[in-house]
Amino acid sequence: MDLEAVVAQFRGKVRKHTLLPMKAIFPPELEDKLKLEFFSGSLSGYFVDIGANDPRDGSQTWPFEQLGWEGVLVEPQHDLAERLRQERRAKVYAVACSSPKNSGKSATLNLAGIHTSLDPDFFVAGMRPVGTSNVLLRTLDEILIDAKAPAPLDFVSIDVEGHELEVLEGFDLDRWRPSLIMIEDLAFNLSTHRYLTRRGYKWVRRTGINGWYVPAESPMTISPMGHLQFFRKHYLGVPFRILREKKRRLTAKWRQG
């Protein structure tokens, strides 16, 4: 498919699925459409994808690369990093992002497909551990400097299975000031939300399990319905979510014998 056809396809989807600005929480199948709408189908931009995983399937940045964007892909699983090098144009770093105090160290990566994590205690229902490997740790700042990334950035996706705060600690938000940060948040607590809001970002949307954050000065706003959705998700629903997850863990341990 040539570039003109790709642009027409995605812009058509954006127009077709433009949503009323009432809701703030949406199902995951609308994620790509809403991202493209956010950037108005722009043909140029710079993305950063931490925990890039598969080159295309479920990729947060593949649609942008199709439109002509440039960027950085960070993927600690060496087999996937090699596939990214073969199938994507963006710069690939086969490392894991962490905090400044961990930079330069080697860490154990607990392999479990899309749920691969640096945290040995990380668990979600359905994950299947398949072993471990060693990976080099670097801060996101170091990677961006090495890649000669522009500032401000346009889009940053963070999907690191429980290591989000450490990644953010190695990411100078004042320097890079991305227009949109999309970060996986299972909503068991407010630690990620508080970190970002204290550093000049505001929550504006959620798609699937990903929170959307934009600079506090952004004109994007949340409706009263959106605020209610946030309160229900991140406050009222937390105790029930924690209990449900504990039940899943116990069930998984019981099945493992």
Question: What does each of the following model-derived ranges do?
Answer:
Residues 1-257:
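Phosphate/nucleotide-binding beta-alpha loop and adjacent structural elements of enzyme active sites
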